[in-house]
Amino acid sequence: MSVKPTKQKPGEPPTTGHSWDGIEEFDNPMPRWWLWTFYVTIVWAIGYSILYPAWPLINGATNGLIGHSTRADVQRDIEAFAEANATIRQQLVNTDLTAIAADPNLLQYATNAGAAVFRTNCVQCHGSGAAGNVGYPNLLDDDWLWGGDIESIHTTVTHGIRNTTDDEARYSEMPRFGADGLLDSTQISQVVEYVLQISGQDHDAALSAEGATIFADNCAACHGEDGTGSRDVGAPNLTDAIWLYGGDRATVTETVTYARFGVMPNWNARLTEADIRSVAVYVHGLGGGE
């Protein structure tokens, strides 16, 4: 409870008037150094709000008298970095792709720069370790749809795959054999069993024998007579154990029925030539480059 102080010894400061179980609190003034510190912070805050950007407005904020901007600082740092690396980046652009590996300094720069570009733009689909995911190719192995040499990788990164924003994008389109009525369900089952056979999986031998003819008539034009695929049209090898969407019976049936149509952006619309070359060198050096 709060009561009016009634007792005060000579020389003692007054109390606050609060008494809790007989315990009272002196009403001592704050130390002078604390008050002056408080006043200084007020002056500093006023000065800061005048000199630096501080107060939000409807369409922006106050700029401050000295015009300081952390964004401008970052932009200056970026420009300074670009200027410092301008020579080697120009060298990277001017050097033949196949000759970059012969220059240790250039190769190291391209690999490091490419890793940064990859982490910023490519990991969303291909994964942070470049091992890919369902529908997104693994870049660590030597199974390439469009070619794994440095020039082929550069072309793929530059123009992309099946996009509508680059006339030179790599393009191929698998027919929807089931959805468009090109094959009936029995024929699809037969050709699926044949694909399982040539890929070394458990299969129905009788259905596979029928599927061989269907494969030759409908699939061999792209995947080859032996099913090993064709890089000219981005047709995958069906005889190995590497599958972009899955190699089990149900998934292969779905692929034959509805087809697949993966798309990759053309990075020449977003990255510089030096960046594209850097990431091509990086991907080529991951282990599966040819």
UniProtKB/Swiss-Prot annotation:
Where does this protein chiefly localize? membrane
Residues the record lists as binding heme c 1? C122, C125, H126, M264
GO MF annotation list: electron transfer activity; heme binding; iron ion binding; oxidoreductase activity
Q: Does the keyword Repeat apply?
A: yes
Q: Topology in the membrane?
A: Single-pass membrane protein
Q: Name one GO biological process term.
A: proton transmembrane transport
Q: Which InterPro entries match?
A: CcoP_N (IPR032858), CcoP_N_sf (IPR038414), Cyt_c-like_dom (IPR009056), Cyt_c-like_dom_sf (IPR036909), Cyt_C_IC (IPR008168), Cyt_c_oxidase_cbb3_su3 (IPR004678), Cytochrome_c_Oxidase_Subunit (IPR050597)
The residues exposed to the Cytoplasmic compartment are: 1-37
| Location of the region described as Disordered in the Swiss-Prot/TrEMBL record | 1-22
Protein location: Cell inner membrane
Where is heme c 2 bound in this sequence? M174, C219, C222, H223
- Report the cofactor remark: Binds 2 heme C groups per subunit.
Query: What phenotype is described for loss of this gene?
Result: Single ccoP mutant as well as ccoP rdxB double mutant give rise to colonies with very deep red pigmentation compared to wild-type when grown on SIS agar plates in the presence of O(2). The same mutants don't have cytochrome c oxidase activity and they accumulate high levels of a yellow carotenoid spheroidenone (SO) during anoxygenic photosynthetic and diazotrophic growth. Expression of crtA in the ccoP rdxB double mutant is approximately 60% higher than that observed for wild-type. Disruption of crtA together with ccoP and rdxB mutants prevent the accumulation of SO.
**What residue stretches are annotated with the Cytochrome c domain?**
109-199, 206-287
ATP-binding: is it a keyword of this entry? no
Query: What GO terms fall under cellular component here?
Result: plasma membrane
Q: Name the cofactor(s).
A: heme c
Which residues does the entry place in the Periplasmic compartment?
59-290
Give the residue spans that cross the bilayer: 38-58
Q: What functional role does this protein have?
A: C-type cytochrome. Part of the cbb3-type cytochrome c oxidase complex. CcoP subunit is required for transferring electrons from donor cytochrome c via its heme groups to CcoO subunit. From there, electrons are shuttled to the catalytic binuclear center of CcoN subunit where oxygen reduction takes place. The complex also functions as a proton pump.
Tell me the protein family, please.
Belongs to the CcoP / FixP family.
Q: How does it assemble?
A: Component of the cbb3-type cytochrome c oxidase at least composed of CcoN, CcoO, CcoQ and CcoP.
> What's the name of the protein?
Cbb3-type cytochrome c oxidase subunit CcoP
Write down the species. Answer: Cereibacter sphaeroides (strain ATCC 17023 / DSM 158 / JCM 6121 / CCUG 31486 / LMG 2827 / NBRC 12203 / NCIMB 8253 / ATH 2.4.1.)
User: Which gene holds the coding sequence for this protein?
Assistant: ccoP
